[in-house]
């Protein structure tokens, strides 16, 4: 792979980021040409992209073929399908699928089997449509009862319950060859603020996080999680500054990889969110995420700027090609098993 191809693999974008179209609902010649020019690592789809079963199947099948033809690897075809509040497929009413409901309800039941069944149900219909990656489960421990961001999405306030149920959802998805992304490291359940809008932080120390928020992620790592999402949450009492976890070498390289022993793929939360765009350009944020140890940059506000920014950073020595190669190796290792 050329440097340009390797860097392209580090990005997971909406189809509209590479094809000049309002809302992508098909993948034809324009998509093929765009992938040939910049073979990105994958795509993330939202409800507007998803109109009917046949339409989604055709679109994703074409994208997969273009990607394989261009670079010899499948694309990550992803969606946010947690169930309930966040369900890009089930919430539309356009698909004959079961909405499994909010994870808070399943958590309150205390029945791990329900979580496994939810994962199987979601995995079944996502796989049928052509998706191979789901931004779920939500592994956040709801330790701040005033947190409305993940209130319905979290399995609750008991780290053991969240841990067991997150794993069960992931296992259910895996039965249908759908990879899961545990989110939002280091835990969105204790935070004040909403990263979609702007700055959000936890005032916990590392020891405090280890006793609660990090437990589900430790369990995921012990069970060979392939993907963990790093959130745009600042943890000033851990890192000593306001850098979001998604851009923090302390959080990703030192803690998640070093102390917790994780060697899977780290994907950032969406880089078009306020917590990032208020502070950084698309290029700065992408470079900073990779310097921190992330592997996949999700949805930069301006993809072309972010992509060029990473290429420039390698060329001027800000990023080493070895750092790029480490991430590409992790990505390819998962893709060859898809």
Segments from the language model and where they lie:
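Phosphate/pyrophosphate-binding betaalpha-module
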Residues: 165-166, 170-182, 212-225
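Short, well-ordered coil/turn segments that N-cap beta-strands
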Residues: 9, 41, 71-75, 131-132, ...
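Enzymes and membrane/adaptor proteins characterized by extended Gly/Ser/Thr/Asp/Glu-rich
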Residues: 16-24, 34-162, 184, 189-203, ...
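Alpha-helical scaffolding within the catalytic cores
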Residues: 25-32, 211-218
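Extracellular glycoside hydrolase catalytic/binding regions
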Residues: 202-211
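Mature N-terminal segment immediately following signal peptide/propeptide cleavage
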Residues: 1-18
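Mid-to-C-terminal alpha-helical segments outside catalytic/metal-binding sites
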Residues: 315-338
């Amino acid at each position: 792979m050329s440097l340009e191809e390797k860097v392209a693999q580090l990005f997971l974008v909406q189809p509209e980021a590479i094809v000049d179209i309002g809302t992508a609902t098909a993948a034809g010649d324009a998509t093929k040409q765009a992938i040939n020019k910049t073979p990105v690592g994958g795509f993330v789809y939202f409800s507007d992209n998803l109109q009917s079963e046949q339409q989604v199947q055709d679109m994703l099948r074409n994208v997969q073929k273009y990607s394989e033809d261009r670079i010899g690897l499948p694309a990550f075809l992803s969606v946010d399908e947690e169930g309930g509040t966040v369900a890009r497929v089930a919430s539309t009413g356009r698909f004959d699928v079961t909405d499994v409901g909010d994870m808070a309800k399943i958590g309150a039941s205390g029945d791990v089997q329900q979580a496994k069944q939810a994962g199987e149900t979601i995995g079944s219909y996502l796989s049928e449509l052509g998706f191979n990656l789901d931004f779920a489960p939500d592994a956040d421990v709801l330790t701040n009862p005033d947190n409305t961001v993940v209130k319905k999405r979290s399995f609750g306030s008991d780290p053991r319950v969240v841990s067991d149920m997150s794993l069960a959802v992931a296992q259910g998805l895996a039965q249908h060859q759908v990879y899961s992304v545990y989110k939002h490291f280091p835990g969105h359940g204790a935070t004040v603020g909403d990263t979609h809008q702007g700055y959000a932080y936890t005032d916990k120390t590392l020891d405090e996080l280890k006793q609660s928020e990090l437990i589900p992620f430790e369990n995921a790592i012990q069970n060979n999680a392939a993907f963990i999402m790093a959130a745009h949450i600042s943890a000033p009492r851990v890192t000593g500054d306001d850098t979001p976890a998604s851009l923090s070498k302390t959080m990703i390289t030192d803690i998640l990889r070093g102390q917790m022993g994780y060697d899977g793929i780290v994907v950032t939360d969406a880089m078009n969110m306020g917590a990032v765009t208020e502070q950084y350009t698309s290029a700065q944020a992408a470079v900073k995420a990779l310097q921190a140890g992330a592997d996949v940059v999700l949805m930069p506000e301006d993809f072309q700027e972010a992509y060029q920014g990473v290429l420039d950073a390698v060329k001027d020595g800000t990023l080493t090609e070895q750092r790029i190669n480490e991430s590409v190796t992790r990505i390819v290792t998962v893709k060859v098993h898809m």
